[in-house]
């Protein structure tokens, strides 16, 4: 041991650990300075901090090893361990090539050990072996709630979603499209529609489907008193409705095509065998030609469905006389002479390629499709326009669309209106409002399945968010959506960040919700008891997975409860919103019948002539001289 301790002293000439490395050190310092300026420097240091420490310690040990005396490597290592503290008398590293190389080898060795250990490591998720599903809590929903109560979408008693599409932290941004599912009597109107109407944020307009026309009576006065412009489209009682004329909103030829497609998608013609067979395509040509002629050439007061019916009635076709020309043919001949490239002329010429017998069948199909317009009240309803759909995003407006929940005869009118509404608002946002409407337009689409097919709705709902438009699709079951929109139903649901389930028993809906909620891990306790000559008793514990809420549990869910699913957040099992606790509940007719809204009186008031309106004045001489 004496021989081992004797060389423990350092050599007579113990050089400083900076010796011979000044130039190298300056170069390294310059490189470190350059790297420090990068944006990811902090992250880089944190990730490599353990390896930097390993490099430093091994490099200092290498420096000490070089200055230890001994006859063999073992002797020098023993001296190193006995005097290890001397390596850190100076905190500065050594820049000797040998020391640096040994330090790098040490750091690389640590990196390799960690890599292979991590690669072969067992993955444990204690308590989550079969699933990690759980119910959300107040902490989960808190970042999504606006401090100002009115500036939220009401979802449940304890959960809300801020109306702003640009929260402080972008990761909490969600679109305001909501799927509400609830069977008959589950409270879709009471627990969702009315509470959100009572919110009345400063810059929000409403468009809502009103089955049976009860919501406008119960909430209309509150909205009117708050300064909302009330609009009513009533397909149950036309006398209690404002006028709606789709022709008023045609701005270009593409709008004509959209209108025709919507009419065909939501009505049926005689002779129609499939959605896109010969007869339907031929009808489309005729509709485009006639509507194009009416829009371009007819005076404004004649641009309506009544004129379209007159054109079809005058479009006689004879099987035995191919050269016969009806009055409509003559009109188009005159137009062709003036404007041979006219949109209506080009469409009509394609239609006229059909033989007399074929043309007659096409006209019969058109007549069957437009049969509802033979009702004088419907023609009067659509004679001119009072809806001002294009202004919904410019001022506080509440449009009530009253439909029958038992008869869908006139629901095609509603489908046409919604199709035009979406297109008008999107175009106005893009062309006149810099991409966003001045007022957010919320569509509360109660009984969505009864509205009819809105063409390309799956694409519309994916793009309306950026224009300050949102839709709440209210259904009795998910299967209703699939019946109408087929494969596009999944796309529509996928573009709704929020799903609210109020209760129901439809099996496919319960299955999908149960699967979406996921599974949680639970503890399973088993006992065994064997009797006989050698009786035994045993107890075992194990873990297993169970649905957070199974289908049978969903079907018997308490009527006061609901399930909320928000994208990126754990689901919530909460109480339905108590409408009586809202500060504006006393303004509804639910609280006081005196608050009932008189629709007929309001319409009469709205139809009064204003002093600023312009009129055509005609003077008639009724004197005796003129009559003589």
Provide a role label for each language-model segment.
Residues 1-208, 215-228, 528, 532-556, ...:
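Accessory regions of macromolecular translocation/handling assemblies
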Residues 44, 48, 54-60, 122, ...:
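P-loop NTPase motor domains
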Residues 133, 160, 176-177, 346, ...:
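General secondary-structure edge motif
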Residues 139-144, 412, 448, 504:
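A short glycine-/small-residue-rich loop at the edge of a beta-strand within enzyme catalytic domains
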Residues 149-155, 412-419, 513:
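Conserved long hydrophobic alpha-helices within structured protein cores
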Residues 461-563:
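Conserved ATP-driven motor cores of ASCE-family P-loop NTPases powering translocation/secretion/packaging/pilus
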């Amino acid at each position: 041991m004496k021989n081992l301790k004797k060389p423990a002293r350092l050599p007579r000439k113990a050089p400083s650990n900076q010796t011979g490395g000044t130039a190298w050190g300056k170069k390294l310092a310059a490189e470190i300075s350059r790297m420090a300026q990068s944006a990811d420097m902090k992250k880089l240091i944190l990730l490599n901090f353990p390896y930097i420490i390993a490099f430093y310690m091994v490099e200092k040990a290498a420096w000490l090893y070089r200055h230890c005396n001994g006859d063999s490597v073992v002797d020098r290592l023993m001296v190193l361990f006995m005097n290890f503290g001397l390596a850190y008398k100076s905190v500065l590293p050594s820049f000797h090539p040998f020391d640096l190389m040994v330090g790098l080898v040490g750091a690389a060795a640590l990196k390799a050990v960690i890599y292979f250990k991590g690669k072969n490591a067992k993955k444990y998720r204690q308590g989550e072996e079969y699933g990690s599903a759980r119910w959300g809590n107040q902490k989960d929903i808190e970042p999504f709630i606006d401090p100002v109560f009115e500036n939220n979408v009401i979802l449940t008693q304890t959960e809300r979603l801020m109306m702003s599409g640009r929260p402080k932290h972008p990761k909490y941004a969600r679109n305001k499209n909501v799927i509400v599912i609830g069977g008959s009597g589950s409270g879709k109107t009471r627990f969702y529609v009315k509470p959100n109407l009572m919110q009345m944020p400063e810059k929000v307009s409403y468009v809502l489907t009103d089955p049976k026309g009860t919501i406008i009576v119960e909430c209309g006065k509150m909205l009117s008193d708050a300064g909302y412009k009330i609009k009513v489209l009533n397909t149950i009682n036309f006398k209690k409705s404002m006028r709606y004329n789709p022709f008023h909103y045609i701005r270009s030829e593409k709008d004509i095509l959209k209108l025709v497609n919507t009419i065909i998608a939501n009505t049926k013609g005689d002779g129609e065998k499939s959605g896109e067979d010969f007869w339907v395509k031929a009808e489309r040509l005729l509709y485009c030609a006639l509507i194009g002629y009416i829009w371009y050439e007819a005076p404004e007061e004649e641009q309506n469905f009544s004129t379209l019916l007159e054109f079809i009635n005058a479009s006689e076709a004879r099987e035995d006389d191919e050269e016969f020309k009806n009055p409509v043919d003559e009109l188009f001949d005159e137009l062709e002479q003036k404007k041979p490239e006219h949109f209506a002329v080009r469409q009509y010429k394609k239609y006229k390629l059909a033989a007399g017998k074929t043309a007659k069948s096409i006209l019969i199909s058109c007549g069957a499709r437009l049969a509802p317009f033979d009702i004088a009240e419907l023609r009067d309803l659509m004679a001119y326009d009072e809806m001002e759909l294009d202004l919904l995003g410019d001022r506080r407006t509440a449009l009530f669309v009253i439909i029958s929940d038992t008869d869908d005869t006139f629901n095609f009118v509603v489908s046409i209106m919604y199709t035009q509404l979406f297109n008008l608002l999107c175009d106005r946002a893009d062309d006149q409002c810099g991409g966003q409407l001045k007022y957010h337009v919320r569509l509360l689409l109660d009984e969505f399945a009864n509205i009819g097919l809105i063409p390309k709705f799956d694409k519309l709902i994916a793009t309306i968010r950026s224009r300050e438009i949102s839709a709440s699709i209210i259904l009795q079951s998910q299967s209703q959506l699939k019946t109408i929109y087929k494969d596009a139903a999944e796309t529509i649901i996928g573009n709704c960040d929020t799903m609210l389930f109020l209760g129901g028993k439809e099996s496919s809906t319960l299955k999908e919700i149960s699967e979406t909620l996921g599974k949680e891990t639970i503890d399973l306790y088993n006992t065994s008891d064997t009797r006989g000559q050698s009786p035994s008793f045993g107890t075992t514990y194990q873990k297993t997975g169970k649905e957070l809420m199974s289908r049978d549990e969903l079907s018997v869910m308490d009527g006061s409860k609901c399930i909320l699913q928000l994208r990126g957040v754990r689901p919530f099992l909460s109480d339905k919103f108590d409408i009586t606790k809202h500060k504006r509940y006393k303004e509804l007719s639910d609280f006081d019948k005196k608050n009932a809204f008189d629709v007929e009186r309001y319409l009469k008031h709205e139809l009064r002539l204003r002093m600023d309106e312009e009129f055509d004045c005609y003077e008639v001489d009724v004197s005796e001289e003129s009559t003589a």
